[in-house]
């Protein structure tokens, strides 16, 4: 990859920073504990931010896409991610567990129905939750759609070299020549190792690859995030775990489930030059869900921090706010 070029900050498009009014650790089972937080209006319309990865975790930046005077904003970290414990753990960590965890959090917070806001893997989990619990959902805002199909996983592991050959070459050549015939299997084996001298170099290589391909014009600070070893290990290990198991979803299951949620308001925001999650997937979802609003951002890739993506997500949430306020 050539030297990263700084893009204008998208922060000016967001709402002011707000601090959590409440937070906690929710026991999910005998092994996993979920970190959660709530900010904004405690009596407001509930909205939950569903982070990507899987394994990505929630960040303070993710509180700022919504008007804190209107929304009761919930952020949380999925199993093995962020401040949930144990970090980077893939035991009892499947899509079905994550759907059940989200429902457990809703019940814990006393929320009847909420808006789902998720991008990338967050869109996958939002759709999986909504199709399992449509009566608990007020609406959806999705970004950079990923449906966890084998074709999408193969694209991530191999196809992105068509656009980012330098980044893919570094990713592949991290492995010895004998292991390059099956990148996913051999990365998964290394990332699953309990030995830090084995799993950490693999995690850094995986995270550098994904970061390099995430934005139309990469930002230097985004490419530096792999300096955080715990975050790099969580996202690499958990992504590889999900990918090797096809996302714990039958191919086509999420699209087939759209019939159960077509009555819900939804906006799909997609970067035209998203290489991580190419527009063909969002297009398929939009065709299966003609009632949804489909917005293609002409000058953006995958990253939520790209100004065009940020702008359209804020607009989408504001439209959802107007819809709920008019009820």
Indicate residue ranges for each PLM-predicted region:
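Conserved acidic catalytic loop of the alpha/beta-hydrolase fold
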Residues: 96-114
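Catalytic active-site module of serine/aspartate enzymes centered on a nucleophile-bearing elbow/loop
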Residues: 292-327
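A catalytic-pocket lid/entrance helix-loop region that shapes and gates access to the active site
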Residues: 137-187
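N-terminal cap/lid segment of alpha/beta-hydrolase-fold proteins
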Residues: 11-34, 239
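Short beta-strand/loop motif that positions the catalytic acidic residue
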Residues: 261-262, 268-270
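Conserved alpha/beta-hydrolase "acid-adjacent" motif
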Residues: 250, 275-281
